């Protein structure tokens, strides 16, 4: 299916690995010219080259920067003053006891997971409204709806993503611009693979059974009882980025494998 994304310019933050990289690949597969972002220039260049080889008819570019830093964002804006699609994927997480979270850590999570995406949306939204097309997508988490006690500082910011996206969608009324949030469930990224290795490397469970054991014992509410693959999130995000996804805005979209037990 042609999603109508050919030659659309898409900025995907935090796109050198994991879900962000998968989103960038699927957008490029649909013909979009993606801007790859990450903090390490070598990692950014590597992904740009990979996508160029995979999809030679597209024009991927790199924007190495820590977009939690305001000066880095200003440099990005000078280099890329307009985009058609903004995917705010960049974020940090860290399991921590509530009692051990310092004020500085709360501030850091808010700055990285909320304010960076807010600043990008504030800059790029006016052009989208002017051209009467645009997509802003926040990548949140099922933790936005089902906060755990393992990392409250992370859960809080993901819930804030939902609220922010809903508020921004009010500014697009009557236009072809949409603002939505996607909430992935537990996904087999490089970080999760490393977590599984750390959890099970001393156990008697065979590596090929780690995933099933993890889902059974740590994600029992999942209806699919497997980890979601990054490319599944990527394909869904590509659709939400497309002109075909024009009938909803301000939505909190679940791609969680049925992990969240509520209807609404």
Give residue ranges: language-model regions:
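Conserved glycine-rich cofactor-binding loop
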Residues: 9, 16-17
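Substrate-binding pocket helix/loop in short-chain dehydrogenase/reductase
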Residues: 97-98, 105-110, 218
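Active-site helix of classical SDR
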Residues: 121, 157, 165
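Alpha-helical segment proximal to the catalytic Tyr-Lys
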Residues: 126, 170-171, 246
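Residue(s) in the substrate-gating loop at a strand-loop-helix junction
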Residues: 141
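Short C-terminal tail/terminal secondary-structure segment
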Residues: 146, 238, 249-264
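Short, small/polar-rich loop/turn modules that mediate ligand/substrate recognition or access, typified
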Residues: 173, 178, 248-250
């Amino acid at each position: 299916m042609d999603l109508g994304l050919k030659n659309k310019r898409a900025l995907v933050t935090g796109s050198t690995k994991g879900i962000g990289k998968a989103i960038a690949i699927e957008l490029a597969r649909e013909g979009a010219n993606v801007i790859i972002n990450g903090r390490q220039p070598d990692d950014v260049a590597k992904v740009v080259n990979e996508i160029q080889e995979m999809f030679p008819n597209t024009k991927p570019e790199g924007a190495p920067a820590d977009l939690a830093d305001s000066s880095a964002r200003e440099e990005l804006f000078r280099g890329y003053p307009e985009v058609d699609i903004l995917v705010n994927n960049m974020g940090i997480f860290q399991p921590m006891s509530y009692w051990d979270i310092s004020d500085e850590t709360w501030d850091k999570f808010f700055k990285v997971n909320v304010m960076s995406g807010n600043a990008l949306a504030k800059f790029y939204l006016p052009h989208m409204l002017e051209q009467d097309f645009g997509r802003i997508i926040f990548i949140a988490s099922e933790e936005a709806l089902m906060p755990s006690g393992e990392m409250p500082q992370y859960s809080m910011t993901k819930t804030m993503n939902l609220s922010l996206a809903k508020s921004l969608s009010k500014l697009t009324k009557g236009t072809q611009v949409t603002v939505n949030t996607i909430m992935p469930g537990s996904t087999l990224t490089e970080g999760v693979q490393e977590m599984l290795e750390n959890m099970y490397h001393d156990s008697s469970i065979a590596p090929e059974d780690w995933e099933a054991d993890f889902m059974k014992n740590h994600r029992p509410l999942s209806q699919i009882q497997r980890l979601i693959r990054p490319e599944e999130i990527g394909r869904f995000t590509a659709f939400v980025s497309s002109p075909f996804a024009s009938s909803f805005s301000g939505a909190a979209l679940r791609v969680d494998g049925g992990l969240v037990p509520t209807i609404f």
